[in-house]
UniProtKB/Swiss-Prot annotation:
Name of this protein: Cyclin-D3-3
Family: Belongs to the cyclin family. Cyclin D subfamily.
PANTHER family for the chain: CYCLINS
Gene assigned in the entry: CYCD3-3
SMART domains registered for this protein in UniProt: CYCLIN, Cyclin_C
Pfam name, any one: Cyclin_C
Organism, as annotated: Arabidopsis thaliana (Mouse-ear cress)
Length: 361
């Protein structure tokens, strides 16, 4: 009798939790149905991994959106001198980034510090060294924030630096940048939204790295264009992600863009305007424009046929030379005919072998 009472007391807590278990089970089935529906629309996602973090993700996203810096860069856009200084400074920053192998966020932070600083301080046209010293200080600070190993201050001055500054001068400039920026060295950037979307939607591993790499590469390629200063990080991130999704053909571009704009709470008109500018810098368009600008061949006119790769819309050119009056083109044409004949023979032999192998013995 005592044993039966002890068993009942031990099983009591589990009986109390039976109701909760049933509710969780029904909720689980609903989540599975939602995940199945989402996987059909987005086969590159693995949504089941992040369902339990939805509330935390919503709070994080709201924080990112609220902490965005206001777009107050009209002063740069209206000043040709500042635009030119910015182009030279960013060109040097990206060269040093490649030289030392810094990550993309380091370069982006340096650009953010530089833009915020030059809008708060007046650059004097009679001091051309000022922009390079500012870029040097901003990159040094960004590396200290983001990188594990940071070069010495004197070692930053590589990649055709026009001026060489002492370490004390760079340190004083760093303090001036820090005080001007109110020591706010962790701004919200488009990369913040890239990381959030990848984690929120739980991209499959073989898509995650490629998607992030393409987004960061496209971002760094368009940042030197001062026109993008008029867009917030969330708008810029949305336009870039839609462009990358379009190139990778992961899912329906329109559906993905609609979901992103709803999630990030961005204006569709601004996103479309930014997207048009992003397309001017897209790799596929650049490859096509570079091919169209190539000079005509002196031997003959090339008829090019383009085939678009389904994975990244890369253009592949297969050109065939037309008959020319020049005698030097005859050996080329003869070799081409011989190659075509060999290809036909190999294909016939392959078909003949397939027929023999499939015939009953």
């Amino acid at each position: 009798m005592a044993l039966e009472e002890e068993e009942e007391s031990q099983n009591a807590p589990f009986c109390v939790l039976d109701g909760l278990f049933c509710e969780e089970e029904s909720e689980f089935h609903e989540q599975v149905d939602l995940c199945d529906e989402s996987v059909e629309k987005f086969p590159f996602l693995n949504l089941g991994l992040s369902d339990h973090d939805m509330l935390w993700d919503d709070d994080e996203l709201s924080t990112l959106i609220s902490k965005q810096e206001p777009c107050l860069y009209d002063e740069i856009l209206d000043d040709e001198f500042l635009v030119l200084c910015r182009e030279k400074a960013l060109d040097w920053i990206f060269k040093v980034k490649s030289h030392y192998g810094f990550n993309s966020l380091t370069a982006l932070l340096a650009v953010n510090y530089f833009d915020r600083f030059i809008t708060s301080r007046k650059f004097q046209t009679d001091k051309p060294w000022m922009s390079q010293l500012t870029a040097l200080a901003c990159l040094s600070l960004a590396a200290k924030v983001e990188e594990i190993r940071v070069p010495f201050l004197l070692d930053f001055q590589v990649e055709e630096a026009r001026y060489v500054f002492e370490a004390k001068t760079i340190q004083r400039m760093e303090l001036l940048v820090l005080s001007t920026l109110d020591w706010r060295m962790h701004p919200v950037t488009p990369i913040s939204f890239f990381d959030h979307i990848i984690r929120r939607y739980s991209f499959k591993s073989h898509h995650q790295l490629e998607f992030l790499s393409r987004c960061e590469s496209l971002l760094l390629s368009i940042i030197p264009d001062s026109r993008f200063l008029s867009f917030s990080p969330s708008v810029l991130a949305t336009a870039i992600m839609v462009s990358v999704i379009r190139d990778l053909k992961m899912c329906d571009e329109a559906v993905y863009q609609s979901q992103l704009m709803t999630l990030l709470k961005v204006d569709s008109e601004k996103v479309n305007k930014c997207y048009e500018l992003v397309l001017d810098h897209s790799p596929s368009k650049k490859r096509m424009m570079n091919w169209m600008q190539q000079p005509a061949s002196p031997i003959g006119v090339f008829d090019a046929s383009f085939s678009s790769d389904s994975s990244n819309e890369s253009w592949v050119v297969s050109a065939s030379a037309s008959v020319s009056s020049s005698p030097s083109s005859e050996p080329l044409l003869k070799r081409r005919r011989v190659q075509e004949q060999q290809m036909r023979l190999s294909s016939i032999n392959r078909m003949f072998f397939d027929v023999l192998s499939s015939s009953p013995r």
